[in-house]
A protein has these predicted regions:
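Extracytoplasmic small-molecule ligand-binding "clamshell" domains
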Residues: 29-32, 37-118
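Acidic, polar ligand-binding/catalytic clefts
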Residues: 86, 91-156
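Short coil/turn segments
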Residues: 45-48, 70-72, 120, 144-148, ...
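Ligand-binding cleft/hinge of the Venus flytrap
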Residues: 55-67, 81-90, 169-187, 192, ...
Length: 212
C-alpha cells in the first residue's frame, strides 16, 4: 500500500495549460494545421490521475482519445478542455502523447494546446506560451508503508533511491534540493511498478496525484 511523505521540497509546483503562440505568420507548410479548423486539438498524457486518465467507456463525461482506438479520457484537465472548446465554439479532440512529445506537438502545429499539469518553467516559456496558472500543488514522496521510515526532513533523503519523471519539474526539484540517488523514469506507471518491485524506495509526485 502506498504512503505519502508530505515534507518534500520547500516549494509549490505551479501548473498551467500551454498554448503555442510563437508563430506570428502562416505559411503553406502550416496551412491546415490544428488551429485553422473548427476543431480544438488538445494534447495530454491521459495517464496522470486525477488530472487526466484513460478509461474504456464514456461514463461521467469522458471524451474519446482521438489517436487511441476505443479508449476515452477524463479528469480535471479534460473538463477544462471541454470548457475552453465550448467557449471558443469548437469541437474538442483530445490526443494522447508521451510527456516529451507534448511540446513538439504544439510546435509542429499538430496540437493547438497542452492541458497536462505542465509547469511554466523559463525553459518551456522559450518554446511555447502559457496561460495563467489554473492549479497549484505541493510535491510529495510516494512510498510503501515499510519504506523510508526514518525520513522526516529533506536531508534524510540523502542516498535514498528516489525516482522522478524525466523532463519534469519534479526531477529538477529532486536533483537540486536533495542528495538522493535520483532515478529518472518515463512515467508514473513505470515508477509505481518500480516501487512495488523494490527497485526504488519512493517517487516524486504532486499531492493530488499521489492520493489518486
Amino acid at each position: 500500500m502506498k504512503k505519502i511523505i508530505a515534507i518534500l521540497m520547500a516549494l509549490v509546483l505551479t501548473a498551467g495549460f500551454a498554448a503555442c503562440g510563437n508563430t506570428a505568420t502562416k505559411t503553406e507548410d502550416n496551412a491546415g494545421s490544428a488551429s485553422d479548423s473548427d476543431v480544438l486539438k488538445v494534447g495530454m498524457e491521459c495517464n496522470y490521475a486525477p488530472y487526466n486518465w484513460s478509461q474504456a467507456d464514456d461514463s461521467n463525461g469522458a471524451v474519446p482519445i482521438k489517436n487511441v482506438d476505443n479508449m476515452y479520457t477524463n479528469g480535471y484537465d479534460v473538463q477544462v478542455a471541454l470548457k475552453i472548446a465550448e467557449a471558443l465554439g469548437k469541437k474538442l479532440e483530445i490526443y494522447s502523447y508521451e510527456w516529451d512529445s507534448l511540446i513538439p506537438g504544439v510546435q509542429s502545429g499538430k496540437l493547438d494546446m497542452i492541458i497536462a499539469g505542465m509547469s511554466p518553467t523559463a525553459e518551456r516559456k522559450e518554446k511555447i506560451d502559457f496561460s495563467n496558472n489554473y492549479f497549484t500543488s505541493n510535491l510529495v514522496i510516494v512510498k510503501k508503508a515499510e519504506n523510508l521510515k526514518d525520513v522526516k526532513t529533506i536531508a534524510d533523503l540523502d542516498g535514498k533511491k528516489i525516482a522522478a519523471q524525466s523532463g519534469t519539474f519534479h526531477l529538477t526539484a529532486l536533483s537540486e534540493q536533495t542528495k538522493a540517488a535520483a532515478n529518472e523514469m518515463s512515467d508514473f506507471t513505470t515508477m509505481l511498478i518500480a516501487l512495488k518491485a523494490g527497485t526504488i524506495e519512493g517517487y516524486v509526485a504532486e499531492e493530488p496525484t499521489a492520493m489518486a
